Amino acid sequence: MSQFPEVLDNNLLHAENNETAEYIQNDGTNQSEVFMEHPYTPNMHPINMPSIVEGAVHPYNNLIHHNDAIPPAKYASMRQMTEDFWREKKQKMTEISEEDMLNKSKNMSVPMARVKKIMRIDDDVRNFMIASDAPIFMAQAAEFFIEEMTAMGWQYVSEARRRILQKADIASAVQKSDQFDFLIDFLPPKTVPTTSTNGPGHMSEDSFQDPNMHSDFHQRTSNSSVNRSHHN
């Protein structure tokens, strides 16, 4: 029909594949946009995506390959990560100014009241005075302690090519270091993931079970029954 072009806006031109629309602005400049029928998902393959007109601005070009791949571990080993961690912390504490130190002491991540309470748990310490800067030193040491264990957990996750940090990762990473032997009694035992009903790849805290739990239980029960028989 001859009146059909008059119905359309003169500033809008539709492409033949209905995937691009080129806007001709009043000043004569052109701007192209791509309209996607389906939103981007991490598992979308480029061959399944709509065709892209050459020269058009595509907002997802930089996400197709970079968002899917899990980056490799930054450090080759846990020891290298730990050495770099403490080198950075030492340099940071050496270069800190007095003003920053005062501000840091007033805004500690670890509660100062909790630190003072822990420092007075020992009966031998209750009879002595604690200097005002001692809790600040202990609070900063506690922050470094937490940061190091977290960094070790992330290194363990990166080596396993995963994205989510779980408490089992921190426990596994800490158990590899001799300097954390005093935490063995507080760390959960090494566990194996089990299948969850929430979907593939999903692992909750309840899905971790100790493979030796049942054998240890039966061994303890059998030993207790033997001891009762001897007493009888």
From Swiss-Prot:
Biological process per Gene Ontology, one example term: negative regulation of transcription by RNA polymerase II
Keyword match DNA-binding: yes
Keyword Cell wall biogenesis/degradation: no
Compartments (UniProt record): Nucleus; Cytoplasm; Perikaryon
Self-association and partners: Forms two NF-Y heterotrimeric transcription factor complexes: the nfya-1-NF-Y complex is composed of nfya-1, nfyb-1 and nfyc-1, and the nfya-2-NF-Y complex is composed of nfya-2, nfyb-1 and nfyc-1. Interacts with nfyb-1; the interaction is direct and is required for the interaction with either nfya-1 or nfya-2, and subsequent binding of the complex to the 5'-CCAAT-3' box motif in DNA.
Main function: Component of sequence-specific heterotrimeric transcription factor (nfya-1-NF-Y and nfya-2-NF-Y) complexes which specifically recognize a 5'-CCAAT-3' box motif found in the promoters of its target genes to regulate their expression and control cellular identity in particular tissue types. In association with the components in the NF-Y complexes, represses the expression of the T-box transcription factor tbx-2 throughout larval development, which most likely restricts its expression to certain tissues.
PANTHER family per record: HISTONE-LIKE TRANSCRIPTION FACTOR CCAAT-RELATED, NUCLEAR TRANSCRIPTION FACTOR Y SUBUNIT GAMMA
Name of the protein: Nuclear transcription factor Y subunit nfyc-1
Gene source species: Caenorhabditis elegans
